[in-house]
């Protein structure tokens, strides 16, 4: 006790022995008792997209809820501030809500690059530490990032799609319409990795971008009829976000079977498409664990000033197919 709290006289030899044992055991003070004594509440706000049941961000929210239970004993409260991922104005409003009464720390999913940059500048000016979830922007001030290595995931995806196969002259990349309008492009780094792989290994293959509105099924089918559906022979199709099930539904309804399809994330609808053979592979991640790790790291920083061991905390990329997907969820 005297060594830990610098109370009373301790010989140098004894102090060195105690400090050595502390280091070997990885001991840290009893935070629970200390924080109960301080009675100070801290708030971590998580700025994330709105979601429907079964969607990607539902799993992330589950991780945040699990983490909230773990850190609540230390006087830390977790609050989500949601925005419409298809509305830049909604994102601005969510950021303004945070800045109206700045919290102790912020986790943000940066769907809108320029607006996120403005937001984190304001956070820095207010002295609020922040971390990125799922994707990140070019910025020097973030405390940590928790998510896939985006560029490498795109490179991996291209290898899964093409490796050891006769590749057609054209590959269809299905993208959300917001990319084309320049509003938001959270998978830009993933797409860059994919494109670099193709340039290195299949420079003559044409990449055809197909933009869809995920909220308009009729428009999706019309667009895919004009592109994927109009092609004859073997077709390769890829999507860089969690909505490959939209393509799978189209292929099933149209009775199209000669497609190789690769997507991302283990949503139940995507897993169903894997089981049926409509989608051949998914690059998956345990997104709920990302959220838990991010909250725990922010809590350590707020409570002890403990820096994150790694600034970029890349979660592992798992390759799922119809034979192993049931053992992953």
Residue ranges of each PLM-predicted region?
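N-terminal helix-turn-helix DNA-binding module of bacterial transcription factors
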Residues: 1-39
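N-terminal helix-turn-helix/winged-helix DNA-binding helices
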Residues: 23-56, 61
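Hinge/cleft segment of the Venus flytrap/periplasmic-binding protein
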Residues: 25, 181-182, 198-201, 286-329
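Hinge/beta->alpha junction and helix N-cap segments in small-molecule ligand-binding domains
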Residues: 49-58, 79-90, 147-153, 175-193, ...
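Central regulatory/effector-binding core of bacterial HTH transcription factors
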Residues: 71-103, 107-111
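Hydrophobic alpha-helical
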Residues: 105-125, 208-270
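Flexible loop/hinge segments that line or gate small-molecule binding clefts
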Residues: 112-152, 267-275
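Hydrophobic alpha-helical segments within soluble ligand-binding/sensing domains
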Residues: 145-172, 221, 270, 286-303
């Amino acid at each position: 006790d005297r060594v830990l709290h610098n109370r009373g006289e301790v010989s140098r030899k004894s102090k060195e022995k105690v400090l050595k044992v502390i280091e070997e055991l990885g001991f840290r003070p009893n935070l629970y008792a200390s924080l109960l004594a301080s009675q100070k509440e801290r708030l971590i706000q998580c700025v994330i997209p709105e979601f429907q049941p079964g969607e990607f961000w539902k799993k992330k929210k589950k991780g945040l809820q699990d983490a909230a239970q773990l850190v609540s004993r230390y006087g830390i409260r977790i609050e989500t501030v949601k925005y419409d991922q298809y509305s830049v104005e909604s994102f601005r409003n969510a950021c303004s809500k945070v800045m109206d009464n700045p919290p102790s720390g912020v986790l943000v999913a940066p769907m809108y690059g320029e607006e996120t940059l403005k937001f984190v500048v304001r956070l820095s000016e207010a002295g609020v530490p922040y971390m990125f979830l799922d994707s990140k922007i070019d910025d020097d001030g973030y405390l940590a990032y928790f998510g896939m290595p985006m560029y490498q995931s795109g490179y991996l995806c291209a290898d899964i799609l093409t490796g050891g196969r006769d590749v057609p002259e054209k590959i269809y990349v299905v993208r959300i319409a917001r990319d084309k309008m320049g509003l938001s492009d959270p998978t830009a780094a993933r797409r860059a990795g994919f494109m670099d792989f193709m340039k290195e290994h299949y420079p003559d293959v044409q990449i055809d971008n197909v933009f869809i509105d995920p909220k308009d099924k009729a428009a999706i089918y019309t667009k895919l009829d004009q592109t994927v559906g109009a092609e004859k022979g073997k077709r390769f199709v890829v999507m860089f976000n969690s909505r490959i099930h939209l393509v799978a539904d189209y292929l099933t309804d149209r009775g199209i079977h000669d497609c190789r399809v690769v997507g991302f994330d283990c949503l139940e609808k995507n897993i169903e498409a894997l089981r049926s053979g409509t989608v051949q592979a998914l690059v998956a991640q345990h997104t709920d664990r990302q959220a838990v790790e991010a909250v725990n790291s922010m809590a350590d920083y707020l409570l002890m000033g403990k820096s994150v061991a790694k600034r970029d905390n890349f979660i592992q990329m798992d390759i799922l197919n119809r034979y192993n997907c049931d053992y992953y969820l």
